Amino acid sequence: MKIGVIGGGSIGLLISAYLSDGHEVTIYVRRQEQKQVINEYGIRLAHQREPLSVSALLTEELAKEDCLFICVKQFQVANITPLFNKHQSPIIFLQNGMGHVDLLRDIQAQVFLGIVEHGARKINDHTVAHTGKGGIRIASYNGDRSLLEMMVSKWDRPDFPIELEDDWLSMLGKKLVVNAVINPLTALFGVPNGDIITNPYISTIALELCREAADVLGLDFSEQWNHVKEIASNTKENMSSMWKDIEEGRQTENEAISGYLLHHANHDIPFTQFAYNSIKALRLKKELMD
């Protein structure tokens, strides 16, 4: 298959690397420098010596693909949606949070939604470390289920599993709970994901964040708390994307995660409010220091 991956961050690089085995993968990036280095050196998984053959183009050079994986941050989706009606390839969105769902109505192509449970760390423009083995889950938003089944059968592999889900809303909700717990806490305390369960003081806060998120989304708390702990354990050495965004002075997905819960809550959720305000404060502090 001809697969396009939009986004040259850690997840975009990881997906491009694994799917390049048996498929023709093109990664679409924002910067000319990254395009050049990938075309020259390929993409390398940090635990492997040999680079993998992947082509790179700039995002505005989007060509016809058999399918597209959208791996940009939540707040970047709106900027690229006008490109999607050009070729109408089936599209798989892999964002944190749920705010991007409101942007999908005007897309004429078949749309699928997914979540990523892997840990990944971008080392440089063409190298990514696979820091936590998990999986990718995909459900249909308005796309043909049989088409999705066919595509997943071609992509799924033991070391990079891709699974089908029936209910996209429940799937995204469960991932939002995980993000609402792990992302702000790891960013605030500067710790890897595993500390969510190994540090008893952080774990106490994590439990309350999970309780609030599950309540807002109408999900079972005990089930979600077990899921959060499982993800934190599987990606225990990973530093969350929010921590990396804070460290590098980039915009975070705070609005799409904690902000989404605050907007949809019908009562006070104090732990989530604290997490939201704290990430805002941390980013402002970083900006002033820089």
Where do the language-model regions lie?
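Helix-loop-beta segment of a Rossmann-like dinucleotide-binding subdomain
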Residues: Q88, T127-R137, G190-I196, N238-E248
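Rossmann-fold dinucleotide-binding core
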Residues: L94-M171
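Rossmann-like NAD(P)(H) cofactor-binding subdomain of soluble oxidoreductases
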Residues: R44-T127
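NAD(P)+-binding Rossmann beta1-loop-alpha1 motif at the extreme N-terminus of oxidoreductases
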Residues: M1-P51
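NAD(P)-dependent Rossmann-like dehydrogenase/reductase catalytic/cofactor-binding core
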Residues: L207, R211-D290
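Alpha-helix C-terminal capping segments
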Residues: S16-D21, L57-A63, I80-Q88, V101-Q108, ...
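Hydrophobic anchor at the start of a short beta-strand
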Residues: I3, H23-T26, I91, V111-F112, ...
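Active-site-proximal catalytic alpha-helix in oxidoreductases
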Residues: L169-A214
